From Swiss-Prot:
Protein name, per record: Putative odorant receptor 65b
Side Cytoplasmic, residues: 1-55, 110-144, 240-275, 329-381
Example GO BP: signal transduction
Physiological role: Odorant receptor which mediates acceptance or avoidance behavior, depending on its substrates. The odorant receptor repertoire encodes a large collection of odor stimuli that vary widely in identity, intensity, and duration. May form a complex with Orco to form odorant-sensing units, providing sensitive and prolonged odorant signaling and calcium permeability.
Source organism: Drosophila melanogaster (Fruit fly)
One Pfam family, short name: 7tm_6
Quaternary structure note: Interacts with Orco. Complexes exist early in the endomembrane system in olfactory sensory neurons (OSNs), coupling these complexes to the conserved ciliary trafficking pathway.
Length: 406
């Protein structure tokens, strides 16, 4: 692992935060990708051609199969203990989510890389030259937001990993960070102390590696949609200030034509992004809903035990927090995209321009009336309205369980 390459995002982010006049040379998604490359788990054709990279990817996939199979086998030991089964199922769902994402981006790595390259090439979206629109404030805000997102996530991830790895030291019924079972009872400390130590180290290392990779891919995914949202904001700025240069008819026609193409490029990249993340968006919606339902079920069943209720309440909040983050990001994308038609309407000036200019503005107005959405068909789009519907559904499940058990 290339530590310097991995930490570059934090160094650049801190310098950008400290110096208001400093501009990062790349967008945040470029640095997220660099972190995944530093971990040797950015699965593109180009990366697999590097020395030993393909072998490392294969080794990681084998470790994932072993990790998931041992946890699934450990579930059989929890039969009869509903609380322990709930914990095991929660970790199994989380492990399955990570494994699915890893294998998924093994197939879609090249498409993801192309989306990142296209977005980074268009960044900061504004037309270069004299007197550009004031995009620096938005660019800085999105980059610093990504930096603080990465920093806060990393901080809480370190706490979570510390609790997981040290849990056998303060939880008497647990002898491994994750409940698992191996053939010949290799996981039993009293029978096989050496193999138990190896399994302990394997689970600790693999949890650190996989959860760090998950943080990077989640940050990358969120920031890709945030970058598209920033592109929409710049497009709106340029539309509202299209007459700032006092263009002649020919120059104004060229400018409106460029903005039509920029709008089309944003729509095209969003469509490709939704295609790339189609499987993962469906999976995370399913996993989050499953974790929330499982947490509600276990908390209701063990409602007389405050410790158990607190554990599953935290799990439920984590799942809802993850879903709310994606819903908010999708909602912002949709809301900002609806401002495009308003900005194009403001750009209309009957005293300036020609029929071709008005036609270009009409094209943007017509396209801008349809909101751009983060969606994985056939499921509904990610926004706060659908998020509220999910919360209502969870509340309905909780009410039903309480009435049934009472």
């Amino acid at each position: 692992m290339d530590i310097q390459r991995f930490l570059k995002f934090y160094k650049v982010g801190w310098k950008t935060y400290r110096d208001p006049l400093m501009e990062a040379s790349h967008s945040s998604i470029y640095y997220w990708r660099e972190q995944m490359k530093a971990m040797a788990l950015f699965t593109t054709t180009e990366e697999r051609l590097l020395p030993y990279r393909s072998k490392w990817h294969t080794l990681v996939y084998i470790q994932m199969v072993i990790f998931f199979a041992s946890m699934s086998f450990g579930l059989t030991e929890s039969m009869g203990d509903h609380v322990q089964m709930g914990r095991d199922l929660a970790f199994i769902l989380g492990a399955f989510f990570i494994i699915f994402k890893t294998y998924y981006f093994c197939w879609y790595g090249d498409e993801l890389d192309q989306v990142i390259s296209d977005l980074d090439a268009l960044h900061p979206w504004a037309q270069k030259g004299p007197n550009p629109v004031e995009y620096q404030t938005g660019k800085r805000w999105y980059f610093v937001m990504a930096f603080f997102l990465a920093t806060s996530w990393s901080f809480f991830l370190c706490i979570l990993l510390l609790l997981l790895i040290t849990s056998p030291m303060w939880v008497h019924q647990q002898n491994l960070p994750f409940h698992a079972a191996f053939p010949f009872q290799w996981h039993e400390k009293s029978l096989h102390p050496i193999s138990h130590a190896i399994i302990y180290l394997f689970q600790s290392y693999f949890a650190v590696y996989c959860l760090t990779w998950l943080l990077c891919i989640e940050g990358l995914s969120i920031c890709i949609y945030a970058e598209i949202t920033f592109g929409i904001e710049v497009l709106c700025l340029e539309l509202r200030q299209i007459h700032r240069h006092n263009y002649g008819l020919q120059e104004l026609r060229m400018e409106t034509n460029r903005l039509v193409k920029l709008h089309q490029k944003i729509v095209e990249i969003l469509d490709r992004t939704n295609d790339v993340f189609h499987g993962t968006l469906i999976m995370q919606m399913g996993v989050n809903f499953s974790l929330v339902s499982l947490s509600v079920l276990e908390a209701v069943e063990a409602r007389k035990d405050p410790k158990v209720v607190a554990q599953f309440a935290v799990l439920m909040l984590l799942a809802l927090g993850h879903l709310s983050m994606w819903s908010y990001c999708g909602d912002q994308l949709s809301q900002k995209s609806l401002q495009i038609s308003e900005a194009a309407y403001e750009a209309y000036d009957p005293t300036k321009g020609s029929k071709d200019v008005y036609r270009d503005l009409c094209v943007i107005i017509r396209r801008g009336q349809d909101p751009l959405i983060m969606r994985a068909s056939p499921f509904p789009s990610f926004n706060l309205i659908n998020y509220s519907a999910i919360l209502n559904q969870c509340y309905g499940i909780l009410t039903f369980l309480l009435k049934t058990l009472d």
